[in-house]
């Protein structure tokens, strides 16, 4: 955040807020301090809210899953966007 943004009170874009939250969740998950995938329903709701600002989608149009294979975690987000 720049000094000018701080002084003028410029708000962050919702996409950057969502990105920061996702980075925090993934960093926290990597430390092994949380139960596996207990945050996925909340993450899905927040993603639907952010994406709905730009494209008309519902809860059923977005699916979030977390797969673990050995030391690798894959967070998969599938979004069905209706055609106009």
UniProtKB/Swiss-Prot annotation:
Keyword annotations from UniProtKB, A to Z: Cell cycle, Cell division
UniProt xrefs under InterPro entries: MinE (IPR005527), MinE_sf (IPR036707)
BP-aspect Gene Ontology terms: cell division; regulation of division septum assembly
Keyword DNA-binding assigned: no
Superkingdom to which the source organism belongs: Bacteria
Residue intervals passing through the bilayer: none
Pfam families xref list: MinE
Keyword Cell cycle on entry: yes
NCBIfam families the record matches: minE (TIGR01215), PRK00296.1 (NF001422), PRK13989.1 (NF010595)
Matching HAMAP family: MinE
Cited function: Prevents the cell division inhibition by proteins MinC and MinD at internal division sites while permitting inhibition at polar sites. This ensures cell division at the proper site by restricting the formation of a division septum at the midpoint of the long axis of the cell.
Family: Belongs to the MinE family.
Protein name: Cell division topological specificity factor
Gene name in the database record: minE
